């Protein structure tokens, strides 16, 4: 059957082609004549066409008079003035006669043309066209001549009919006459066929060129994005850590030089684009070819706490960059892929905490397309960095050094009990605000991948930290007093980390010291892993549900902190809608905050730290499992409780603020002021971070590069976001 259908189709197509070829000699000549006459008749049958013709005649006649000086204006004007002065009525009558004669002739000619259009041929139409052009000067005499010519035209038509009869009798003569017409039609058809072919070829060439240009642009953007990321990280390093910034700047310059040499070798015409990228016109997240760097690098790579460690890492990076520069010269094609991975690794090594900010732009663009590439990169990066993963002790030491920064507030809190509560609550409020917003931004896809690794790392790190943190806290006080400025610069980063960590550890009702110490621990985890935050976020939602009543009592000094944070966010983002979202996000945490201050005893906290931390680990595991079941049921209750909290907090904020101000001494107020003002001083990193919170997130996609631990985190983050939208509305 298939063969028969194919043959039938082929036969039909061939017959159609044959019929066309056979009909070409007979019909096309006639068809062309008919189409020409019909076109002329249809066009000139409408009065608009004649109006256009008249307008053209008048305009071009005026142009000719002016261009060639056909009129003697002086004599004409003088004679006309003299005539008007002598006999004005004669001039008017003469003008009226001329115009009436011209108009009469014009309309009579129109009537003749319209009446005789059906009988006319191309020749007759040409004669009428000539008559039309000559009408105005010749007037009535030409009209009579046109009528006589029109009488001759039907005779010519009769002759043409005779020729058709002769064609039927003598086909050879007619074929000889019509052969040129056939050839013309065939040529036209061939040309028409060739034109689309040329168009298709041109389109293919254009597509190829555009594809090449797009590839080149992506390469440029990749390289330019590398340079910009390097520069941004260098600027951030200068703000936070002044000593290690010099080797990093040298590395940045080396990178820029390597990329420029490559581009000069490969693309000479790209230098202009490179200059644009160097000057920073391209935004960090615009290079589509760069997939978002993975937070697994953070887990495997500890953030440098001291300048000595950072300098060592900088030397390692330099060695890696030298190797990469040599390989780039040898293999230009392979480097385009490798350089993306290596640059992403280097940028995250320099500041994984801040690289996450730059990642936020890229995550939105290439999140979906790069998910598969991220998995491959995770495998390659894990193989490259087994030594770093095998050294948890070194990480713990660095983490201890980083715990020093958040340890300030809890230890100074021991001196004045009321101040302790105020400062702990302020820090917790800020940290929890970030935690709530980060919950919403958690990507759902990466949660599945990293749950197992996060739990194992959390257990190892916490077991090592329990014994070491108590020893570190005493020398920490002296160090913090010596270096307040540098720590204040680092506070924005530590606050972000504390937001992630405290959100998770608020689940355990324990004294604020323990919570402060616990806050110290998870900061490196969040920078390195960014994963425990999500499992902890799930616990935060439970806290919101379990402890609504205490939120009213304890969350009141914390609400003061919320106001300060709101003011900072509103100043940085002049957008009304995002601020509303931020306010709702900041108002929800009071339910979370109450979990911490329940146990106030602080002398016994140190004794029970080791036992409680072990129980906390077991509690987290059990809660993470239970979260999967309870989150859906508790979503509705959390929203209602948050609405109640808004009403309570609005009434109680002013009174609480005055009480807290009285309790806090001047020195600690100044420190809190520095904590609040520090984000304004370092506008570039923090404003970008907060803008992503407020602007970009709709509750449907993931904002941040942090890999979540569990699906419950994803479901909870998405559940809260619509609830907060309802509150905002």
UniProtKB/Swiss-Prot annotation:
Keyword Ion transport in record: no
Acidic residues composition bias: residue spans: 117-129
Lumenal-facing ranges: 69-729
Biased composition (Polar residues): 8-24, 715-729
GO molecular function: protein-macromolecule adaptor activity; signaling receptor binding; transmembrane transporter binding
Membrane topology value: Single-pass type II membrane protein
PTM note: Phosphorylated by CaMK2. N-glycosylated.
Result, substituting residue 59 to R: In CARDAR; results in intracellular retention and degradation of the mutant protein
GO BP term, pick one: muscle contraction
InterPro entries found in the cross-reference section: Asp-B-hydro/Triadin_dom, Triadin
Domain of life: Eukaryota
Residues on Cytoplasmic side: 1-47
Pfam families, sorted: Asp-B-Hydro_N
Compositional bias of kind Basic and acidic residues: 130-265, 309-357, 371-433, 444-509, 516-531, 538-562, 580-598, 609-674
Membrane-spanning ranges: 48-68
Protein localization: Cell membrane; Sarcoplasmic reticulum membrane
Glycosylation sites: 75, 647
Keyword Cell inner membrane: no
GO CC, any one term: junctional sarcoplasmic reticulum membrane
Record keywords, A-Z: Cell membrane, Disease variant, Disulfide bond, Glycoprotein, Membrane, Phosphoprotein, Sarcoplasmic reticulum, Transmembrane, Transmembrane helix
Associated clinical condition: Cardiac arrhythmia syndrome, with or without skeletal muscle weakness: An autosomal recessive cardiac disorder characterized by stress-induced arrhythmias in infancy or early childhood. Patients present with recurrent syncope or cardiac arrest after physical activity or emotional stress. Sudden death may occur in early childhood. Some patients have muscle weakness.
Role description: Contributes to the regulation of lumenal Ca2+ release via the sarcoplasmic reticulum calcium release channels RYR1 and RYR2, a key step in triggering skeletal and heart muscle contraction. Required for normal organization of the triad junction, where T-tubules and the sarcoplasmic reticulum terminal cisternae are in close contact. Required for normal skeletal muscle strength. Plays a role in excitation-contraction coupling in the heart and in regulating the rate of heart beats.
Oligomeric form and interacting partners: Homooligomer of variable subunit number; disulfide-linked. Interacts with CASQ1 and RYR1 in skeletal muscle. Interacts with CASQ2.
Name of protein: Triadin
Annotated organism of origin: Homo sapiens
UniProt lineage: Eukaryota, Metazoa, Chordata, Craniata, Vertebrata
